[in-house]
Amino acid sequence: MNPSSVPHPLPPPGQQVIHVTQDLDTDLEALFNSVMNPKPSSWRKKILPESFFKEPDSGSHSRQSSTDSSGGHPGPRLAGGAQHVRSHSSPASLQLGTGAGAAGGPAQQHAHLRQQSYDVTDELPLPPGWEMTFTATGQRYFLNHIEKITTWQDPRKVMNQPLNHVNLHPSITSTSVPQRSMAVSQPNLAMNHQHQQVVATSLSPQNHPTQNQPTGLMSVPNALTTQQQQQQKLRLQRIQMERERIRMRQEELMRQEAALCRQLPMETETMAPVNTPAMSTDMRSVTNSSSDPFLNGGPYHSREQSTDSGLGLGCYSVPTTPEDFLSNMDEMDTGENSGQTPMTVNPQQTRFPDFLDCLPGTNVDLGTLESEDLIPLFNDVESALNKSEPFLTWL
């Protein structure tokens, strides 16, 4: 053992020990040589397990020659195919004996190509007018010569839906499967379909017998059609009921309008009309229309039980001016006859009030006064009128 590899005793606490390497370059060169120039050695000198030096006894440790626990012998392998042997968890391997496994082993070992999973609907015949063809890559699609459509969906799967599924989803119909055009993804198939449309002229019910189809499958489209008709009837009834309610509402509005017109006083006929001919024509077209007033696109909107002339739909207007006010229009001083006042009014009514006579300086002829002479007179009038409010001044 190398003495340098022996661990040195621990120094006492509180002391330090310094180790000095004598030949560092020689030891480093030896390490490089041992790695770069390894010496040949026998495998026997290495610490290896015993199974490393022994050949395998059988093929049980190899994937290529694995055997079945039931005693079956492996059959010949096929190039390019998947080898299928009976698994250890198969119930058949537990029930069969050694002799039966040896006889049935090669028959069950077979290879198959990749294909679609098995479907029960593949055994059913296609509906009348349908044809199944394949693309260049082996993908199948279906042609309907009656409706002249092309789809990836199998029409037999739609017919094979259970009846309880139809009851849970009544809106699903036989034609609800989305039909995607083949011309978008497969242009060549669209041209091929045009050539195959000629076959549709020779199709007839005799060429496509339906006796082989089960009765349950044929009743599904009938049930779907019946439910669709019932839904259409319900929608039609709702539309009719809504139309009847609109008509009754319109009649009620017309009756209310007639009642309000009868309650109108007769004096309103003598009032000045405001665009009554044009308004009555438009209103007559609205009220006499048999359609919904909210749907005919008219510019008028009605409001229930409104007596405001600006918002009502009637052909009347409620007066807001007192009736006895208009009869006294002749007594009022308006701007129209203001220019005729000096000739029609009595000259005695133009004299100043009596209280001006008691004021100083007012015993002179007022007609001969100039504007400058009237200024002190106006000041006296202001002082007489503003005795209670002496703090106010005129500007």
Swiss-Prot record:
SMART domains cross-referenced by the UniProt entry: WW (SM00456)
Record GO terms (molecular function): protein homodimerization activity; transcription coactivator activity; transcription corepressor activity
The entry's keywords: Activator, Cell junction, Cell membrane, Coiled coil, Cytoplasm, Isopeptide bond, Membrane, Nucleus, Phosphoprotein, Tight junction, Transcription, Transcription regulation, Ubl conjugation
Protein's GO biological process: cilium assembly; glomerulus development; heart process; hippo signaling; kidney morphogenesis; mesenchymal cell differentiation; multicellular organism growth; negative regulation of canonical Wnt signaling pathway
UniProt main location, coarse: nucleus
Pfam family, one: WW
GO cellular component: bicellular tight junction; cytoplasm; cytosol; nuclear body; nucleoplasm; nucleus; plasma membrane; transcription regulator complex
Coiled-coil regions, chain positions: 224-258
Modified residues (Phosphoserine): 62, 89, 290, 306
Crosslinked positions (Glycyl lysine isopeptide (Lys-Gly) (interchain with G-Cter in ubiquitin)): 46
Residue numbers covered by motif PDZ-binding: 389-395
Domain WW, first and last residues per copy: 124-157
Alphabetized Gene3D superfamilies for the sequence: 2.20.70.10, 6.20.430.10
Post-translational modification as stated in the protein's UniProt record: Phosphorylated by LATS2 and STK3/MST2. Phosphorylation by LATS2 results in creation of 14-3-3 binding sites, retention in the cytoplasm, and functional inactivation. Phosphorylation results in the inhibition of transcriptional coactivation through YWHAZ-mediated nuclear export.
Bias kind Polar residues: ranges: 61-70, 277-293
Tissue specificity field: Highly expressed in kidney, heart, placenta and lung.
Region (Disordered): 52-116, 277-308
Cell location: Nucleus; Cytoplasm; Cell membrane; Cell junction, Tight junction
Known outcome of mutating residue 89 to A: Loss of YWHAZ binding with increased nuclear localization. Partial recovery of nuclear accumulation
InterPro entries named in the record: WW_dom, WW_dom_sf, YAP1
Domain notes: The PDZ-binding motif is essential for stimulated gene transcription. It localizes the protein into both punctate nuclear foci and plasma membrane-associated complexes. Binds to transcription factors via its WW domain.
Subunit architecture: Binds to SLC9A3R2 via the PDZ motif at the plasma membrane. Binds to YWHAZ in vivo and in vitro through the phosphoserine-binding motif RSHSSP. Interacts (via coiled-coil domain) with SMAD2 (via MH1 domain), SMAD3 and SMAD4. Interacts with MED15. Interacts with PAX8 and NKX2-1. Interacts with TEAD1, TEAD2, TEAD3 and TEAD4. Interacts (via WW domain) with PALS1. Interacts with LATS1. Interacts with YAP1 (when phosphorylated at 'Ser-112'). Interacts (via WW domain) with PRRG4 (via cytoplasmic domain).
Protein name: WW domain-containing transcription regulator protein 1
Organism: Mus musculus (Mouse)
